[in-house]
Amino acid sequence: VKWPNDLVLGGRKLGGILVEGRMQHALLQRLVVGVGINLVAPPVDVPHAVSWSEWETPPTADRVRRALVDRLVLGLRTVLELPSPDLWGFVSQRYTKILWGLGAPQELSGRTSPEKKHTVLLVGPTEDGRMRVLRDGVPDVLHQGEWVWSYP
């Protein structure tokens, strides 16, 4: 996973994850999870995209869908059984293990100033889902949507 939600294969974007939740009185009321995977062809408007078929014969969309739902249900059952104080530690530890590019230099630009490039070193996620980095050698915290990430 490339922060915050890209699925990466061979250093290129294979798909993405979108999670939206609704809280009420500090409790999660609703959660919607969307996953998109380029099985056969990458989108033409994403130059750094890749499709599963470029690596091997992809499974059918139904098979992928069933596997994703099975894993998601298993993961949600595990997480929902945890006491609230332990939840972030559990999720963050697993997210950090699969985070692409952690500890390696990454190039990004501001969404409002794409011509200005920065080199960051990914340090790890914060408790609220932002990313701790060293940006041009200075500690910083990045917010989702403010930055555009380069691909190699």
Name each model feature, range by range.
Residues 1-3:
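General beta-strand structural signal in soluble alpha/beta enzymes
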Residues 9-152:
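Long, positively charged amphipathic alpha-helical accessory segments at protein N-termini or as interdomain linkers
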